[in-house]
Amino acid sequence: MEAILEKVDDSNISGIHAFIFEGTHFDMPWHFHPEFEFTYILESSGTRYVGNNISDFEPGDLVMIGGNLPHCWKNENDHTGTSRSIVIQWKQDIIHDLEVFRPIQELLLRA
Protein backbone atom coordinates (compact mmCIF):
# COMPACT_ATOMS: atom_id res chain seq x y z
CA MET A 1 0.00 0.00 0.00
CA GLU A 2 1.34 3.43 -0.91
CA ALA A 3 1.44 6.04 1.86
CA ILE A 4 -0.17 9.41 1.23
CA LEU A 5 1.36 12.76 2.15
CA GLU A 6 -0.55 14.46 4.97
CA LYS A 7 -0.52 18.26 5.03
CA VAL A 8 -0.06 19.15 8.69
CA ASP A 9 -1.69 22.39 9.86
CA ASP A 10 1.14 24.92 9.91
CA SER A 11 -0.89 27.98 10.84
CA ASN A 12 0.49 28.08 14.39
CA ILE A 13 3.43 30.48 14.56
CA SER A 14 5.21 28.20 17.05
CA GLY A 15 5.57 25.44 14.47
CA ILE A 16 3.74 23.02 16.78
CA HIS A 17 0.36 21.47 15.97
CA ALA A 18 -1.32 19.73 18.93
CA PHE A 19 -4.79 18.27 19.10
CA ILE A 20 -6.95 15.58 20.66
CA PHE A 21 -8.42 13.09 18.24
CA GLU A 22 -11.75 11.62 19.30
CA GLY A 23 -13.95 9.39 17.19
CA THR A 24 -15.51 5.97 16.93
CA HIS A 25 -12.43 4.53 15.16
CA PHE A 26 -8.87 5.46 14.35
CA ASP A 27 -9.37 5.69 10.61
CA MET A 28 -6.51 7.84 9.31
CA PRO A 29 -5.06 6.19 6.20
CA TRP A 30 -1.45 5.00 5.90
CA HIS A 31 0.29 8.37 5.65
CA PHE A 32 3.47 10.36 6.26
CA HIS A 33 4.52 13.98 6.79
CA PRO A 34 7.86 15.74 7.26
CA GLU A 35 6.97 16.77 10.83
CA PHE A 36 7.95 14.74 13.89
CA GLU A 37 5.05 13.40 15.94
CA PHE A 38 4.17 12.13 19.40
CA THR A 39 0.95 10.12 19.66
CA TYR A 40 -0.39 9.19 23.09
CA ILE A 41 -3.30 6.74 23.20
CA LEU A 42 -5.94 7.77 25.73
CA GLU A 43 -8.65 5.28 24.85
CA SER A 44 -8.91 2.36 22.42
CA SER A 45 -6.85 -0.59 21.23
CA GLY A 46 -5.93 -2.22 17.95
CA THR A 47 -2.95 -2.41 15.61
CA ARG A 48 -0.30 0.26 15.09
CA TYR A 49 1.66 0.44 11.83
CA VAL A 50 4.84 2.56 11.93
CA GLY A 51 7.37 2.11 9.13
CA ASN A 52 7.97 -1.64 8.85
CA ASN A 53 6.81 -2.30 12.44
CA ILE A 54 3.38 -3.73 13.23
CA SER A 55 2.39 -3.80 16.92
CA ASP A 56 -0.66 -3.82 19.13
CA PHE A 57 -1.60 -0.57 20.86
CA GLU A 58 -3.59 0.15 24.01
CA PRO A 59 -4.32 3.06 26.35
CA GLY A 60 -1.15 4.57 27.77
CA ASP A 61 1.00 3.91 24.70
CA LEU A 62 3.25 6.79 23.65
CA VAL A 63 4.93 6.65 20.25
CA MET A 64 7.47 9.03 18.74
CA ILE A 65 7.46 9.09 14.95
CA GLY A 66 10.27 10.50 12.85
CA GLY A 67 9.68 12.80 9.92
CA ASN A 68 8.48 11.18 6.68
CA LEU A 69 7.93 7.81 8.38
CA PRO A 70 4.64 6.23 7.21
CA HIS A 71 2.22 5.34 10.01
CA CYS A 72 -1.38 4.71 11.03
CA TRP A 73 -3.44 3.19 13.84
CA LYS A 74 -6.33 0.83 13.14
CA ASN A 75 -9.00 -0.57 15.41
CA GLU A 76 -10.31 -4.09 14.99
CA ASN A 77 -13.43 -4.36 12.81
CA ASP A 78 -15.58 -5.26 15.83
CA HIS A 79 -14.34 -2.27 17.87
CA THR A 80 -17.03 -0.41 19.79
CA GLY A 81 -16.59 2.63 21.96
CA THR A 82 -14.46 5.72 21.62
CA SER A 83 -10.98 6.11 20.17
CA ARG A 84 -9.04 9.01 21.67
CA SER A 85 -5.45 10.17 21.37
CA ILE A 86 -3.31 13.23 21.91
CA VAL A 87 -1.22 14.11 18.86
CA ILE A 88 1.64 16.62 18.84
CA GLN A 89 3.35 17.38 15.52
CA TRP A 90 6.23 19.80 15.04
CA LYS A 91 8.55 20.97 12.34
CA GLN A 92 12.01 19.45 12.48
CA ASP A 93 13.77 22.80 12.61
CA ILE A 94 12.12 24.29 15.71
CA ILE A 95 14.64 22.67 18.06
CA HIS A 96 17.56 22.55 15.64
CA ASP A 97 19.25 25.77 16.72
CA LEU A 98 18.87 25.47 20.49
CA GLU A 99 21.85 23.76 22.18
CA VAL A 100 19.73 22.62 25.13
CA PHE A 101 17.67 20.46 22.73
CA ARG A 102 20.66 18.78 21.03
CA PRO A 103 20.15 15.39 22.81
CA ILE A 104 16.47 15.45 21.82
CA GLN A 105 17.39 16.38 18.24
CA GLU A 106 19.75 13.39 18.03
CA LEU A 107 17.06 11.07 19.39
CA LEU A 108 14.48 12.39 16.93
CA LEU A 109 16.81 11.93 13.98
CA ARG A 110 17.16 8.25 14.91
CA ALA A 111 13.37 7.79 15.23
Where are these regions (language model features)?
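Generic protein-terminus/edge-of-domain signal
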Residues: 1-62
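A hydrophobic/aromatic-rich effector-binding and dimerization subdomain
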Residues: 3-10, 66-111
